[in-house]
Amino acid sequence: MSKTKIGKIITLEGIEKSGKTTQAQMLSHYLRKERHLNTAHFDLPDYQTDVGKLIDKYLNYAEMPANPEVLHLLYAANRYEIRDVINFHLNDGYVVIMNRYYQSNLVYGYVNGLDTDWLSILDENMPRSDLTIILDAPVQITEKRGTPVNENRFGPAKEFIEKVREAFLSLAEKEKWKVIDATRSKEDIHRDIIRIVENQF
């Protein structure tokens, strides 16, 4: 990979506890240290922003169950909060690493019974990912890594997450996203990610 005037977006996706945060950090470190590239790393949803705080309140403190349409509109607004920052980095040649992005909106929205065309419209003005990598692991593996956050708002947690995983794999095949076995060590996963990134760019 060589530094260009216009940067790239690499998105890491997958169910909760699949290792996205760790791998995003490792990838960012590798690109800076070994390839001497500028990187920017974003974790979504960002619960520290104004909209993010609304999402957190809506998920955790609302008296009624979360309405899927309202929730996905809020998630979209959360992404739009950082759109200008993403574009700034891209225009400056950065590699932008996304820990979740609009792909999660499509997958979770689909599992929540929402229309995928409507979901796509929500993000049509967001910068597009140049590479999307799915970190795939069965729920039986990820549930041993800790308690998922806000994954069970629409039904039993395990059943819901299994549907999300199936949707990620189905959409990955359709959209030509890369899929990595995330049941292995973080070092093995990192090596696979680097191989994919180097081959892609």
Question: Which sequence ranges carry the predicted segments?
Answer:
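ATP-binding Walker
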Residues: 18
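ATP-dependent small-molecule kinase phosphotransfer cores
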Residues: 37-121
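Hydrophobic anchor at the beta1->P-loop junction of P-loop NTPases
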Residues: 12
